[in-house]
């Protein structure tokens, strides 16, 4: 029996990349998983089909987290399909896309995260777990500068983390824990691709600095592990980038 047998999970931004890997890992542990997409239904349906082919349970749900009805739709989907909501993985993020409004990064990386958690709290019982996914470039932005092309996104993601941490007393009252997973640059993600396009050679330079970069599957496994890990609420799990940790401690 898996660690999440009979439980229900929502993974935001899970039609591809890290979120899709997290959804697969959680389903393999027995959870029924709501796979969230914003526009690309075929990608999400493919993730669901893969989970079901492996004997898991999942459903694809289209929801834009930056509008009020988006988070609510994901909570309802978890309740209607899997009987509740026990694990919430806040993976969706953005801000480097072209053609978006000026404040989109803050709307998605801070406001939408808070709105999603606020909606989820109504459905999550004591003992539930919330996992927020971020990057070292965002988590350590106050002490370690990042590349200019990513700075606005990093600041908005750090604002999101701070806003979620401000909810810790509210979570504690309900017996719900929050864990933050912070990772170095991850090979093969959309963000890494966009950064390398805006700043050619950025990925290779970071790889040389760090020694190695985690793959999407490796990082996804670490995020999924935090859904059941025996760690205190408010814990930050660092994945890769030892130089960031040293710089952050010395700042």
Task: Locate the predicted segments by residue.
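C-terminal helical subdomain
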Residues: 174-182, 197-251
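Conserved glycine-rich cofactor-binding loop
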Residues: 8, 15-17
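Rossmann-fold scaffold of SDR-type NAD(P)-dependent oxidoreductases
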Residues: 12, 85-93, 109, 132, ...
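Catalytic Tyr-X3-Lys loop
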Residues: 100-121, 127, 131
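Catalytic loop of short-chain dehydrogenase/reductase
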Residues: 93-99, 129-173, 185-189
